[in-house]
Each structure stands twice: as C-alpha cells, then as structure tokens.
Amino acid sequence: MRTQRTTPDQILAAALEHAGLRRTQQTYLRLLLTLWLVLPGRHNFTNLARYGPTSDRTHRSWAQKPVPWVQLNSTLVLQAQDQQTLHRSGILGVDAVFIPKYGSHTPDLASYWSGCQGRSVRGLEGTCITWIDPTTHQPVPLSITQTPAELPAGQSRVDFYATVTLNTITQLPEQLRKQVQAVVGDAYYTKLKFVARVVNEGQLPFVGKMRKDANLKHLFTGPRTGKPGRPRLYDGKVSLQDYSRWDALPWADECMVYTVVAYSVSLKRQVRVVAVVWPGSRSSRTEVLFSTSTTMMAATIIALYRARFSMEFPFRDGKRPSVLMGAVLAKKQFAGLSECQSRQVEALHFHLNMALMAVSAARLSQLHDQRASPLVFSMEDEKRRAYNEFFAERILSILTVEQTDQKREDLLADLLSLGVKAA
C-alpha cells in the first residue's frame, strides 16, 4: 500500500505557525503556494486568478505587502532540522542570479552579468543568500533582493552585495545564527569591501576563491634580531609553482592539496590558503581557495566551498531550458522566477522570493519522504503531482454533490474551462 506523501502545503503550513504572520496572510500564502505549483503557464496575477478563487486584484494587493522572507525560510530550515532531514550546521552561500527581462518600464532594468551567456546582458539581477547543509548539500534560499540599477554616489555593487548579506545575517533567528560555519562566495566576492564587512560586522569567517596570481606573502617565523625598528613580518612572496614551503596533505581524489597561512595584500589580513592541484598530461590545473579563519582545516575549506555549488539548484529548479535557435540561450520557469509582469518594486521582490520559496517547499517535502535515501528531486514531477491532485479534487467535489442534470452540466462546463483564457 502506497504511503501518503508529505505535500509542500503541509511543509509551509507548519512553518507559518511559527513565523509570526497574521492568520489572513498565512491563509493567502498557503493558497498561493498551491496555485504556484499547479499553474502550467506563466506565473502572473491574471493566470493565478484563472485557477484560484481570488481575483487578480487581490493577488496584486497581497504582493504589495511585506513578508519576512528570511524569518519564514529560516523556520523551514529549523523545521527540517527538527525532522532530522537537515543537519544542525550550515553555511550561507551568496550569489547573484541573472533574470531575463525585456521592456523599458521595469524597475532597475540594466546590464548584468549572465553566467549562461558569458557576457553582460540587459535584464534584472537578484542577490540570493542561501542556507546550505554542507553534509547533504541541500539548499534553502533565505531571501533574494533585486540589485538596483543606480546606486548612491561612492557606492559600488560590491557594497550593495555586502549590505544584503549583513541584513540577512542580522535577521537570522539566534538558533540558526549559531549554526553558521561561514559565508561562502565565488571569486567575485573576494574583495576587501565585501570580505572586511562580513568578517568585521557579520562576525563570521568568509570562504572563497582566489585568482592564480593572487598577491600573497609568507609570514616570517624566524627569530627576532633585537635591532631597533619594526620587526620583520613577511618572508617573501607565495609561489603557486613551488610548494616546498607549503604543507602537503593526503587526499583521496586524483589531486594534490597544499595549505599555508599567508598574508593577503588585497584583503589586508592573514588567511588560510589551500591549493588544489590536478595533474594533467601537459599542464596541471590549480584551484586556490581560502578562509579568513586561519585555524580552519584545509579539508573543511574545500568541503564548504564545494557545498556552495548546490545553491544553483533552486535557480535551476525555478527555471526550465528553453531552446532558442538550437542552443540553450534563455530559460523559462518551472516556478516563474522571471515571469513577473508587475512594474512595482514591492511586487517584483514578492514574486522572486515566492518563486524560490515554492521550490524550497517542494524540495523539503520530497526530502521528508526520501530521508532514508539520497534525494532524487524533480521540480517538473512536483508540479505534475500538484496539478493532478488539484484537478482530482475538483472532480471529486462535483461527484460528492447531489445535482440535477442541469447543475451537473454547469459544473462540468466549469471544470472543463479551468484555466482557459478568455476569447
């Protein structure tokens, strides 16, 4: 006999009870999650109204109201930890996601870097902070914030990314805040403006990636001369060609791992550097990772940085490949990540966060049912289940009501016109 599965609605309902939202807002978010997963077309207010009991005006009104996304998604994480589907430790991954957008009236429309196309493209960008379980590599996005096209004088996008990261850290529940091992980002975030604020203001270590030509200096560990003047601090530049002054570590993969504590000139601090070298037939390939915590183990740095890549899964699950001229150049949505058609900043913020929360609820529901084995997750299958369940309930609601022939025909006509666009 097939066991009853845990639905995304059940996952969200339990989290809403502890998130401190008003009862009316809880009811609406549960309804919206159901419609979000059911909707086969574009995720906009008009289509949501076609499948649900509320009008598009109601959806537009709710999209203008603030939602504590960090607290709500943090509750999802804590709830999964209580159910032993996530471990009680994690990292905060930071990354920017490019969102294709056309037109000329959308707020903050500008040129942003698109990793898929390898160049800057006109559209939108969201900075996403994701909770990642480094053991199971399961991601739960905490919040996504739209990057403004124009910033105040003297402020760069790196400053904005750092502000978003710190705002998320300050909103974390104390129980979750104590579990954060580090903030992890790719090589773009290895900048003094970002790292210094995360370490000094956020009080968290940062794990990232460096360029192969990073300016690093060995620390001087020799005896003091006793002569007047400033003591010697450094002992030459770190070389990625000669590892004789590095500590070699045994590693199971087909690579060599070396580590050393050095001074980073660009970051203006001591860091633990880890060089992962893959030998090749012609030349070796080197990856330079680091942590601002000099006591962090090299194996931990590698594990945390590798876990960072799982934060791409919610972006992928919120989209589906769209073939354009024989190549995957653009992406469209399983969860409507770039289908918002509103021109209001508040509605855009609501839409982006709702799309990622829908993916999280779907992923956690399957993780709850597959806890005994590695997670096999398909957002397409989850949407199919949600639609089948929604349509079956509509059919059963007709069968359970005593009707005349005319009433039955009216109900059947209503069922067959579900989601149909007006002619």
What residue spans do the PLM features occupy?
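Single, function-defining residue in the core of a domain
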Residues: 1-17, 39, 88, 101, ...
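Active-site-proximal, Lys/Arg-enriched surface segment
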Residues: 35, 63-148, 259-261
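N-terminal short leaders/motifs
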Residues: 35, 40-43, 75-83, 229-238
